[in-house]
């Protein structure tokens, strides 16, 4: 800068200092009014706001101490005790000062602490523009901008237009030199040029891009600084409470060291070995088991896939193999051994009771001999005549009835198919069975429990309130014991029992938390899912990485290290017990060497030969048998598929063939021979007991003659009347009962389908209904009554131990009151505060922390997501925010603070800048002078803002009431509960965990209520009945739509 211009500025400064000294000697300071809560104008020189003071005197101002609280701002920082008295016009001031010329550097003006300015009147002639003048009247001072020239007070030197630095477009001057700033740039101590919304560092000349911020280092994007040093945290990283280690993604550290656990990893109980996916370690050592592997009970041999060990040794059985009771012979598929020897029976075969004859397919033996019955054959009540298909037995004997069978009311014979029970006995009921009210008989299907005992309930079972019986399905636990809870289990408040699915940790122990686990405040337990680190280690966790127990080597993906070194294993790899050889997939090594076995391979007992698939070795040599092959007892002939050999030679029988009892004739398919000769019967044929007449298909003969009965016909006990289908006769007469019907014990009332009668009357119960033990109230579906009253429990409800309150689905009550906990809720150890989803309580109080929240080290303020605390107080910074150098002012995105010469602003005010605007948190809506909101467009145009107060908008944070926000791009959904967010995330991931369990149905759903609604299609359940026309519907919305036909509203 020209030395003459600097000299002129010094002369002006001396002039004002002289005026201040004169006024100090002559004037007294008036009493100062209360200071106003106003923020002085803080803008660049070219946007300074001038207010007309013509013909009026400004009110006196009290002493105002302006002290910068940040000692590291470069440049000359002013500390002044500025006292301003009422201004009056000075007639001697006749010179002008150009608005186009600005003093913009602290270094150019040497202020003197304690200086005062009095008796100065600024009188603008009009609203200032680029070419207008502002006249400042003072003695012996004239500054003119006529013809773009500048005259200094101390000389006649004239600065021409070419000598004045030109500011183009949106450029402005820095406060320390001639550097030009573009756009929203600002600088403090150097000549560095900042572009497009940059902020500046406090101690260096480093350039920051975009929404960067920093303390003393560079922070990019959403980075933030740790509270104890300058470590940079990216994205969702967090640091440990005792060090500067950065955590990535879902990482956490182990409780005993610096090992990093990634994804779903956990460590072993005896060391720091990392387990991947579904891995676990053996009970005797730290050997890692991959996939479905397990070890034997006597050694550490690894079993792959579906292998199990024999009871007498460590031989590995593959697939569906099992061993015989007398030796270690391997049985394949559906094979089993005979009771008298080691003969192998193939799929569907069984032995006769008198010998080792093999029965193939659906064959059974007659009661008088070893004749084989094929298909659905049975014998008559007077002999060994074979009955086929859906045949039934006469009512004069206890012979078994097939397909569609029912029992007479005079005996306890088994009823097949849709059997029901008589009311006079405790016989087992099949299909949709129910129990009587007088006994503890098992109930099948949709069983429910009687109120007088603790019998096991199947299906959607629930437990009684008087014992700790196991509950299946969506079980819940009683409040009086620590029984294991399945499905949506929760923990009782009296013990450290394991909680499954959606588990949370109790506050009294270090129990493992599954799913979206968090750690307890009293221990270093491993946390899964959205894990965080314990306070005892500093290791960095990246993605799915973890470290080895002996060093800080980083393992990526599904890697794990060997027990003897730091070799990295990928995927499902494992190392051998004797070396570091890597095994891939389902590989394992032999017990005698390091040979690698692939897939379902296993080695022979005599050597290291590898057997593939379902292969096994013969008992006499090392020949490999494939698939379902086996060898004959007399030689090493190989039998394929369902083949077997005859007892007298090595003839091979194919598929369903069997030998006759008198020779080696081969019978094919369902053939059998007659009892008098070797005639072959085809298909379902049989011969009568009196001759060799052949009966075809479903035919049979009556017991008194050779009359042929077709299909499913049977004769009555009093004559030869033919009964069709599933018909049977009653015990008191010839009334015909149709398929599924039965008689009551007190009369001839017909019961249809699965009906049964009550113990006190002839009321018919439908489907899965039953009656209560104290009255004839009908319970439908899965309902049951409480032991203390007749309150009806629906679905999976259970009652509390202290009252009759009904608990739904996965609910449980607290140990101190009857408060109901829903879903994954649990209570704290010190009070009944309810924790939802992934919440956990702080170590100093019962405040609930959501999702990825953590507590600050100095107080109970909650930090969300990528928030960090400022180094001086508990202010939370979001995303790209940074704090000002000396106070709680928050800068967002590309914001910056500006300083105006002559009207300096301290950096201790509690105000914030949003985007290109500036606002105050205090009195933001009041039109006080100095509380002006300037648009960034004013800076770009280089114009002064108009003299009016613009309304400022407060920063609104909708995430406060809905802290769980969807992280997918372009999705702005947020929820107040974590479980709601998890359900929503399934729309993005396509996850459908609720699968229909009906055979042949492949439907899957994201929500349980959708699955329950779908199941009604299979069951045919239509519980919603129209009160007008008696039509029923499976869904309530269908009933509402139907109600419009009658012009009524449902429920009215």
From Swiss-Prot:
One Pfam family recorded for the sequence: zf-C2H2
Domain of life: Eukaryota
Family annotation (Gene3D superfamilies): Classic Zinc Finger, Serralysin-like metalloprotease, C-terminal
Record key words, sorted: Metal-binding, Nucleus, Repeat, Zinc, Zinc-finger
Entry-linked InterPro entries: Serralysin-like_metalloprot_C, Znf_C2H2_sf, Znf_C2H2_type
Zinc finger (C2H2-type): 964-988, 994-1018, 1024-1046
Subcellular localization(s) per the UniProt record: Nucleus
Molecular function per GO: DNA-binding transcription factor activity, RNA polymerase II-specific; RNA polymerase II cis-regulatory region sequence-specific DNA binding; zinc ion binding
GO cellular component: nucleus
PROSITE patterns: ZINC_FINGER_C2H2_1, ZINC_FINGER_C2H2_2
Gene Ontology biological process terms from the UniProt entry: regulation of transcription by RNA polymerase II
Family: Belongs to the krueppel C2H2-type zinc-finger protein family.
PANTHER family from the UniProt entry: KRUEPPEL-LIKE TRANSCRIPTION FACTOR, KRUPPEL-LIKE FACTOR 18
Official protein name in the record: Kruppel-like factor 18
Originating organism: Homo sapiens
Name of encoding gene: KLF18
């Amino acid at each position: 800068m020209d030395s003459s211009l600097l000299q002129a500025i010094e002369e002006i400064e001396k002039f004002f200092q002289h005026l201040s000294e004169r006024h100090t000697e002559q004037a007294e300071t008036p009493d100062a009014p209360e200071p106003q809560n106003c923020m002085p104008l803080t803008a660049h020189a070219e946007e300074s706001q001038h207010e007309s003071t013509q013909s009026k005197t400004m009110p006196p101002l009290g002493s105002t101490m302006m002290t910068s609280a940040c000692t590291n701002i470069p440049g000359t920082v002013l500390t002044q005790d500025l006292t301003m008295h009422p201004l009056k016009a000075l007639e001697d001031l006749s010179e002008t000062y150009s608005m186009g010329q600005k003093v913009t550097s602290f270094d150019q003006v040497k202020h003197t602490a304690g200086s005062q300015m009095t008796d100065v009147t600024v009188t603008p002639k009009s609203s200032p523009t680029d070419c207008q003048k502002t006249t400042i009247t003072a003695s012996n001072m004239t500054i003119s901008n006529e013809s773009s020239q500048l005259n200094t007070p101390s000389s006649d030197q004239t600065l021409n237009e070419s000598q004045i630095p030109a500011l183009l477009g949106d450029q402005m001057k820095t406060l320390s030199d001639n550097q030009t700033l573009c756009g929203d740039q600002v600088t403090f101590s150097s000549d560095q040029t900042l572009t497009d919304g940059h902020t500046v560092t406090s101690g260096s000349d480093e350039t920051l891009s975009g929404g960067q911020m920093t303390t003393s280092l560079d922070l990019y994007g959403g980075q933030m600084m740790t509270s104890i040093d300058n470590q940079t945290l990216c994205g969702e990283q967090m640091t440990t409470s005792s060090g500067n280690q950065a955590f990535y993604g879902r990482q956490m550290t182990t409780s005993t060291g610096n090992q990093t656990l990634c994804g779903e990893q956990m460590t072993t109980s005896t060391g720091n070995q990392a387990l991947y996916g579904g891995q676990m370690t053996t009970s005797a050592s730290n050997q890692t088991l991959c996939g479905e592997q397990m070890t034997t009970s006597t050694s550490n041999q690894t079993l792959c896939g579906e292998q199990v060990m024999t009871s007498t040794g460590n031989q590995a059985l593959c697939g569906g193999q099992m061993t015989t009771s007398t030796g270690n012979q391997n049985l394949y598929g559906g094979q089993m051994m005979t009771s008298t020897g080691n003969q192998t029976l193939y799929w569907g075969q069984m032995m006769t009771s008198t010998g080792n004859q093999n029965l193939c397919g659906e064959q059974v033996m007659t009661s008088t001999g070893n004749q084989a019955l094929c298909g659905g054959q049975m014998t008559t009540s007077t002999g060994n005549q074979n009955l086929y298909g859906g045949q039934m037995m006469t009512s004069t004997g206890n012979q078994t009835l097939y397909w569609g069978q029912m029992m007479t009311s005079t005996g306890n014979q088994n009823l097949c198919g849709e059997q029901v029970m008589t009311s006079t006995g405790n016989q087992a009921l099949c299909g949709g069975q129910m129990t009587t009210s007088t006994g503890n008989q098992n109930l099948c299907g949709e069983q429910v429990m009687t109120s007088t005992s603790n019998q096991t309930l199947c299906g959607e079972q629930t437990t009684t309130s008087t014992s700790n019986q196991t509950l299946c399905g969506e079980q819940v636990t009683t409040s009086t014991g620590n029984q294991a809870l399945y499905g949506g289990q929760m923990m009782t408040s009296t013990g450290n029992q394991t909680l499954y699915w959606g588990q949370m940790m109790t506050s009294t122990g270090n129990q493992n938390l599954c799913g979206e686990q968090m750690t307890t405040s009293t221990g270093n337990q491993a946390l899964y899912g959205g894990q965080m680190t314990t306070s005892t280690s500093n290791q960095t966790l990246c993605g799915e990485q973890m470290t080895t127990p002996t060093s800080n080597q980083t393992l990526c993906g599904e890697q794990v290290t060997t027990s003897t070194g730091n070799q990295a294993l990928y995927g499902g790899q494992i190392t051998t017990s004797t070396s570091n050889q890597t095994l891939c997939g389902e590989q394992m090594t032999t017990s005698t060497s390091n040979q690698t076995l692939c897939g379902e391979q296993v080695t022979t007992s005599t050597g290291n030969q590898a057997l593939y698939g379902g292969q096994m070795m013969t008992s006499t040599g090392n020949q490999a048998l494939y698939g379902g092959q086996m060898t004959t007892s007399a030689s090493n002939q190989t039998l394929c598929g369902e083949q077997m050999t005859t007892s007298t030679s090595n003839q091979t029988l194919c598929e369903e063939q069997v030998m006759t009892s008198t020779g080696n004739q081969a019978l094919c398919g369902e053939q059998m021979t007659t009892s008098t000769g070797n005639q072959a019967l085809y298909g379902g044929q049989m011969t009568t007991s009196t001759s060799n007449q052949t009966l075809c298909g479903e035919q049979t003969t009556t017991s008194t003659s050779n009359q042929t009965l077709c299909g499913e016909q049977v004769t009555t006990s009093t004559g030869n009347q033919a009964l069709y289908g599933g018909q049977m006769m009653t015990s008191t007469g010839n009334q015909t009962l149709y398929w599924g019907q039965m008689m009551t014990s007190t009369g001839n009332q017909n019961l249809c389908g699965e009906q049964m009668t009550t113990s006190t009357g002839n009321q018919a119960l439908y489907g899965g209904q039953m009656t209560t033990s104290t009255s004839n109230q009908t319970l439908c579906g899965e309902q049951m009554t409480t032991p203390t009253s007749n309150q009806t429990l629906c679905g999976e409800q259970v009652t509390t131990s202290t009252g009759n309150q009904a608990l739904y689905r996965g609910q449980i009550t607290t140990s101190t009151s009857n408060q109901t906990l829903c879903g994954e809720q649990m209570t704290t150890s010190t009070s009944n505060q309810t924790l939802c989803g992934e919440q956990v309580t702080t170590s100093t109080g019962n405040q609930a922390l959501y999702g990825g929240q953590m507590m600050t080290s100095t107080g109970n303020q909650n930090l969300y997501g990528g928030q960090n605390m400022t180094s001086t107080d508990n202010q939370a910074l979001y995303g790209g925010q940074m704090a000002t150098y000396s106070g709680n002012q928050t800068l967002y995105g590309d914001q910056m603070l500006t300083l105006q010469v002559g009207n300096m602003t301290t950096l201790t005010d509690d105000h914030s800048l949003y985007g290109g605007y500036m606002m105050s948190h205090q009195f933001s809506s009041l039109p006080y002078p100095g509380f002006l909101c300037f648009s960034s467009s004013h800076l770009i145009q280089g114009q002064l803002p108009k003299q009016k107060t613009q309304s400022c908008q407060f920063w609104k944070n909708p995430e406060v009431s809905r802290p769980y926000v969807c992280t997918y791009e372009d999705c702005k959904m947020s929820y107040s509960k974590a479980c709601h967010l998890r359900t929503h995330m399934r729309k993005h991931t396509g996850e459908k965990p609720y699968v229909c369990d009906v055979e042949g149905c492949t439907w899957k759903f994201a929500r349980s209520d959708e699955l329950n609604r779908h199941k009604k299609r299979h069951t045919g359940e239509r519980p919603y009945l129209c009160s007008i026309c008696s039509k029923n519907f499976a869904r309530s919305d269908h009933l509402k739509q139907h109600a419009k036909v009658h012009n009524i509203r449902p429920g009215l």
